[in-house]
Amino acid sequence: MPASPLAPARGRWLVPALIVVVSLTVGGGLLAREVYRKPDAAADTGVIATRTSQSLAPEQQPGSPVVEMTPDAAAHPHADGVRALLQNYFDAINARNYELWKTTVTKLRAQAKSKVEWEADYRSTKDGSILVYRIEAMGDGTLQSLIGFTSTQDPQDGPVDLQEPCVRWHLTLPMVLENGMWKLDAIPAGTTPMHERCT
């Protein structure tokens, strides 16, 4: 007879034990879903692992005008500010908006390029497939961003040594703080950005 009082006790522990097991299973499933969804979430924030412009058909060039970053660049403390600055810079070029462009560069650089000159330089340019590979903080408090992008333009508006309708660029852009805001500085004299014909 002593076995019968124990039976209800076992039944009482079975329900809470099942609740714990089910809760852990559901929680584990939700956690796994979040872990496996992280790449998609990263893509939504403009972080990508590889450059895709090489696979675009000629009529799709220059590709998306949205500035994207590698995971390495996106991990930099100034990534959001750099992305916003570059987005405004390329938006200004694509929209032929000189006034917006002036807000993205240093005062000295803006003064060195008149509106007439700027509009002539970018009259047929469209930029896309913009990828920030790396952001580096320099010892003097400035930043350097290693970027790649594609430009399409009338061939006569391309670089003097590569007058092509589609050019792929790789360059390092210097950025300085001016009145508390990051601005694009002039590329040092004598520096030649790497560029090649789109393939």
For the regions a protein language model found, what residue spans apply to each?
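Residue-identity detector for glutamine
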Residues: 54, 60-61, 87, 111, ...
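Exposed beta-sheet edge and beta->alpha loop/turn motif
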Residues: 3-19, 23-43, 142-199
